[in-house]
């Protein structure tokens, strides 16, 4: 196995509301090209953990390091381009699909390759004509795939995926799983994926399981048959 560089490290991270511990004493690392799943029953803090890594909420205790730096010291805009978060409910904006896919390039003051969008759409079995389709005319599954394609335009080092296949049918769910797996291996992107779907475990290097009652964790390597 080739040596991987460290991208992310959580050290005894915890988060609580005024009355309840949501996650507690979470520690793990994520290396370049590594694929980790986060599983566990509803209410154990999976999405909260992902939002902390995405710098959408701050931990009450512990520290999160990205390439050795505390993420609270980094520019939120720059960090979120390198650590890209895709929510369970996709948040699209503007009038058309094109408005969403061009956005990551605009904020970097760059232009995509002429075929970039067509190639990415084809990977997700979407026609190039969808670029001019109004956001309001998209199905739930189309919205989720467009949101994921938009996140890939940031060329991130880490993808954070929160139940992203929940709105997809079985065919598209398998397709998205395979596409992300290939993308991770080709680009050496690291992935943290929150899921309830045991079928997605087949692509994971390791599985982090959060337990109820303050989201304590256990971590295990996935052994392929």
Language-model segments: what does each one mean?
Residues 54:
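Helix-to-loop junction immediately C-terminal to a conserved catalytic motif
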Residues 62-70, 79:
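Conserved ABC transporter NBD signature motif
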Residues 90-99, 108:
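Conserved catalytic motifs of ABC-family nucleotide-binding domains
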Residues 114-130:
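Conserved ABC ATPase "signature" region
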Residues 134-138, 142:
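Conserved ABC ATPase signature
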Residues 147-148:
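Hydrophobic anchor residue at the start of the ABC signature
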Residues 159-163:
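Catalytic Walker B motif of ABC-type/P-loop ATPase nucleotide-binding domains
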């Amino acid at each position: 196995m080739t040596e991987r560089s460290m991208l992310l490290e959580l050290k005894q991270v915890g988060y609580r509301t005024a009355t309840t511990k949501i996650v507690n004493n979470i520690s793990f690392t994520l290396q370049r090209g590594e694929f980790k799943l986060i599983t566990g029953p509803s209410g154990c803090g999976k999405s909260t953990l992902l939002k902390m890594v995405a710098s959408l909420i701050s931990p009450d205790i512990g520290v999160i390091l990205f390439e050795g730096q505390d993420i609270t010291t980094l520019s939120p805009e720059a960090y979120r381009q390198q650590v890209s978060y895709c929510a369970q409910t996709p948040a699209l904006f503007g009038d058309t699909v094109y408005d969403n896919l061009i956005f990551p390039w605009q904020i970097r003051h760059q232009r995509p390759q002429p075929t970039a969008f067509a190639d990415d759409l084809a990977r997700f079995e979407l026609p190039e004509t969808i670029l001019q389709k109004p956001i309001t005319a998209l199905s739930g599954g189309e919205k989720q795939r467009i949101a994921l394609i938009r996140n890939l335009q940031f060329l991130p080092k880490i993808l954070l995926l929160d139940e992203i296949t929940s709105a997809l049918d079985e065919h598209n769910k398998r397709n998205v799983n395979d596409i992300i797996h290939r993308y991770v291996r080709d680009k050496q992107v690291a992935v943290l994926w929150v899921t309830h779907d045991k079928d997605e475990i087949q692509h994971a290097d390791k599985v982090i399981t959060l337990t109820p009652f303050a989201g304590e964790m256990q971590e295990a390597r996935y052994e392929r048959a």
